[in-house]
């Protein structure tokens, strides 16, 4: 392992101190809690939507979450190991056949729905 990879691994471990990032994939509905600083106040803001893309690049990993707010599509990119992320909760697993769901940008209503992934009894017993 070269020096840069070691430094990145140390930074990832430092960013994850006390936090756990769940396994999630494109198509999953997640609730991302973000620490927001307004003046001298600090609060947690929840952002719920569908993961349409995930980018695995070590310390530079990120994911894009899309939601519909007031009839308008809103996308937000989150850095996976950012200190501003308070927590990530997977609300629902989606069953998709693509890694990038950018086609959802052109769709609205029923055509933008994602099927729910059914968990087999074997997996449910393990979890």
Swiss-Prot record:
One of its GO terms (biological process) is translation. NCBIfam families: rplS_bact. Keywords: Ribonucleoprotein, Ribosomal protein. Disulfide bonds: none annotated. Pfam families: Ribosomal_L19. InterPro entries: Ribosomal_bL19 (IPR001857), Ribosomal_bL19_CS (IPR018257), Ribosomal_bL19_sf (IPR038657), Translation_prot_SH3-like_sf (IPR008991). One of its GO terms (molecular function) is structural constituent of ribosome. This protein is located at the 30S-50S ribosomal subunit interface and may play a role in the structure and function of the aminoacyl-tRNA binding site. It comes from the Bacteria. SUPFAM superfamilies: Translation proteins SH3-like domain. The keyword Membrane does not apply. Coiled coil: none annotated. GO terms for cellular component: cytosolic large ribosomal subunit. This is Large ribosomal subunit protein bL19. Belongs to the bacterial ribosomal protein bL19 family.
């Amino acid at each position: 392992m070269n020096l840069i990879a070691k430094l990145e691994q140390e930074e990832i471990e430092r960013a994850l101190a006390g936090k756990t990032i769940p396994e999630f994939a494109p198509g999953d509905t997640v609730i991302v809690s973000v620490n927001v600083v307004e003046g001298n106040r600090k609060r947690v803001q929840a952002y719920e939507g569908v993961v349409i893309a995930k980018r695995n690049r070590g310390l530079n990993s990120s994911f894009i979450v899309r939601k519909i707010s007031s009839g308008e599509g809103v996308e937000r990119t989150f850095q996976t190991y950012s200190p501003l992320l308070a927590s990530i909760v997977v609300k629902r697993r989606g069953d998709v056949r693509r890694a990038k769901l950018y086609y959802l940008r052109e769709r609205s209503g029923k055509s933008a729905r994602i099927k729910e992934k059914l968990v087999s009894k074997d997996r449910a017993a393990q979890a």
